[in-house]
Design a protein with these regions (language model features):
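Catalytic metal-binding/acid-base residues of hydrolase active sites
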Residues: 2-4, 33-34, 66, 93, ...
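Catalytic domains of carbohydrate-active enzymes, especially glycoside hydrolases
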Residues: 15-27
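Histidine-centered catalytic micro-motifs
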Residues: 1-6, 29-32, 119
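Acidic/histidine-rich helix-loop elements
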Residues: 2-8, 36, 71
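Extended substrate/RNA-proximal surfaces in nucleic-acid metabolism proteins
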Residues: 38-139, 207-214
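Glycine-rich, proline-tolerant flexible connector loops at the mouths of alpha/beta enzymes
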Residues: 28-41
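Charged catalytic cores and adjacent phosphate/nucleic-acid-binding surfaces used
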Residues: 1, 97, 105-214
């Protein structure tokens, strides 16, 4: 989810409140970053602490490395972690944008990356590397980014890579219910069991890997 500290429309508190009303238990706010705006991570952490200390929802601070040169992705992931990001995504080679070739490969090779978001026509080699490095792949609810969901679901399932279903929320209308998220997983070709894994078990594994308690 993205706040107004990158290209989202809402403050972290309003994102959390709207998610809470939809019965979400845990969300991550992962604003778009490159070397120019890493300070956005620290800006949201105090607000996230306020939310976690007072509301019945868990908010995880994170970052989504976006449109950066592939050569600096691992460096940016390390810096983001030091600044307080507990979960690191990379903005993958979606069919909807001219993401630089090599981004997917750099992301799955990095031990500091947790999720490769909307990876488009990700290759077999890249998926195998993702499995070896414990990098999850995203099934996206977002228009445009969702175009390769079927490909991602199929190749990830064949190789045994964990999948995550994400909204890529930028505005209030992007937030969805658990039932809607299940349908997106099924629409991508996942079985009911695999869709549930992508919505419940796999996110918990990532949170545990990041040391987040919930």
């Amino acid at each position: 989810m993205h706040s107004l500290f990158s290209d989202g429309e809402l403050l972290p508190s309003e994102i959390a409140r709207r998610a809470q009303v939809l019965d979400h238990e845990t969300i991550a706010i992962t604003d778009h970053v490159d070397s120019s705006n890493l300070e956005a991570i620290s800006k949201i952490i105090e607000a996230i602490d306020d939310i976690n200390n007072n509301w019945d929802i868990n908010v995880v601070p994170g970052a989504e490395i976006t449109h950066a040169p592939a050569e600096v992705i691992d460096k940016l992931a390390k810096k983001s972690r030091k600044l307080g990001a507990e979960i690191i995504l990379v903005h993958g080679e979606t069919l909807a944008e001219p993401v630089v070739e090599g981004t997917n490969l750099a992301a799955v090779k990095s031990s500091n990356v947790d999720i490769l978001a909307h990876p488009g026509l990700i290759t077999l080699e890249e998926v195998e590397i993702a499995k070896n490095n414990n990098v999850s792949l995203e099934i996206s609810a977002r228009k445009g980014h969702c175009l390769a969901n079927g490909h991602v679901a199929s190749i990830a399932t064949d190789i045994g890579v964990d999948l995550i279903i994400n909204t890529d929320t930028h505005s209030p209308n992007d937030l969805i219910t658990f039932k809607q998220a299940q349908k997106i997983g099924l629409g991508a070709g996942l079985t009911k069991d695999k869709a549930m894994e992508a919505l419940v078990e796999n996110p918990k594994k990532i949170l545990e890997k990041c040391g987040f308690t919930y």
